[in-house]
Amino acid sequence: DEKSFIVGTDSLRVIIRDCPLRMTWQRRADDWVTVSEDRPTGAYEIGTHTGQVAHHRVRNIDDRYYGLGEKSGDLERTGRIFDMRCLDALGYDAGSTDPLYKHVPFLMTRTANGAFGIFYDNLSASRFNLGAEVDNYHRPFTSWQADHGDIDYWVMTADHLCDLTPQILRLTGDPAFLPRWALGYSGSTMHYTDAPDASHQLLKFIDLLREHAIPCDSFQLSSGYTTMGSRRYVFTWD
């Protein structure tokens, strides 16, 4: 027979069930309301040979998903699959390219019962399926899958999505407060160094800054400013 037990506080609790293992997260409103529920059919997967791991949760029709760091397309992520890797995606399409330069495995969900956040503490390459996949043998679901490591996650709840931000910052730490001198504009490009009249292009850039009254604290030639054939390099060994 299925067994269950409850662990929680005055504002948040988790109901843990076995056969198979799954969890239901609830927050206190006027009564206890569910904000996240593991898929009842195989919520957790651990590949004994591949090392891959996965976590599947129930997707309700009115759930809306946000977060994941720098991603293309709308801020509302529902219905897409996102690859959590870092690439130099030069020339990417702002509406569809994935992955991009940086990501954060923190997913926020707006539910009918409040906001729910889940942060996966795993450094390997991973993927989020936010409703793009449909499987006849399971209820509608979302998934997180990682190539290696543990299924190790943190959860948080709030009345509104914006209230989740202070909570994740308490966990990961605040961004460093920049000094005033670091807030200026720094120009950067690879285009000028490719031009046959590179020196003229650089001086023209300075003239344009003056024309439009744009202050500029520094300028760099960016990555790839040396070349060998068709390839770019940060520097070239002699």
Residue ranges and their predicted role:
Residues 181-183, 216-217:
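Residue-level recognition of the N-termini of beta-strands and the immediately preceding loop/turn
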Residues 183-193, 222-227, 231:
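Aromatic-lined carbohydrate-binding surfaces of glycoside hydrolases
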